[in-house]
Amino acid sequence: DALFTDGTMSELTKNVDLDEINQMLEQSKTHPNVYLTERLQIAKDILEGKNIAQEVFTVEQRGDGVFHARNILKTSSYGTNLLPTGIAALAGEQIKVYVEVEEGKPLPKITFSQQVGHWNNWQRTYNLKQGENVFTVPKIYSETWTHKVIAGGAIYIVNPYTPEQQGKAPRIRIEGGHNYPLFHDGDNVEVFIQELREYQEKLTAEPNKYVDIVELVNDYAIVNSNMTSALLFLNSPESTPQKTLGKFFAYAGISEQGDDIKHKRNGARANLRLMQPWAFAYAAGDHTGFQQGSANTLFGGSIYGWAEAHEIGHHFDIKGGFIGEVTNNMWANYNRMLQNETDRIAD
């Protein structure tokens, strides 16, 4: 590891010579230490011009949004700490994760997911250590599920820490898997549209090699779906869920500003996902699950329908102050008002 400047193994220390690395690689052919050979090969790739450093990303330090939502804001089940990486992987694939964190500070974790998963079976989370971590992507998908999809899904990082807790932000490099279209609010729309077109071509040509996944991310939400939904996004690329979710927070009495932490969103983020059917839509402990039509609505930028707002309302319900299947409908009714629709009860 003295070859590299940090745990991401993306930059070499000074005075590393290609001829010397080649000699050591030749010698390593008779050496049982595969660990050493892999590092020498990485060093050779860098010396021969491969820009591994561009694969490194800095991990967000948003703090523990789940704890804040459920213990400070007192919502029933709102919030996720998942951080999208834009990398997906198939079940059985080997993934290497290189991590650099300040010495003695808490480490992030990694989550492997199943795209269009089951409400209580769609993710696996593992610890990370400094330097290299090797994983075989777990198979979560079941052939008994209603919607038949490829076994695999997005890779997420979980890092529920602030700079005060963790110091310098962790840096991570993931080797393996494949990139999927991921749009962060504020990204270049034209670049994203081109990524969508290219990914659609890959899915069409080799459907068994790529996960059918597209995600939109902003400070309010992760919105997960597939290329079917993304085609609608192409028609209205300026649309994101931010404005609609902001209205929900305002209605709940949760603000973006002010000094009282008990009433501030403080980075709490929703997790809205295309999932296997479990009713038309549902609210689980860490996400809201939708079917294709509802996911299309989210991607198209339209305001939610009754079912979507009803389920999100479950997450917003306040602990100790809600009546199941009743108070969550405040958000559904509020949605009706936003759209100037008539409520059948009012009639």
Identify the role of each PLM range.
Residues G131, E143-T146, N188, E198, ...:
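Short, solvent-exposed coil/turn linker segments
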Residues R173-E215:
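Low-complexity, Pro/Ser/Thr- and charge-rich linker/hinge segments at domain boundaries
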Residues S10, N71-L73, Y78, Y210-V211, ...:
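Extracytoplasmic low-complexity repetitive segments enriched in small/polar residues
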Residues D1, I21, A43, V189-L203, ...:
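Generic structural signal of hydrophobic/aromatic residues within well-ordered alpha-helices
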Residues E26-H184:
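Beta-strand-enriched, solvent-exposed domains that form extended recognition/catalytic surfaces
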Residues Y199-D347:
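Catalytic cores of extracellular degradative/oxidative enzymes
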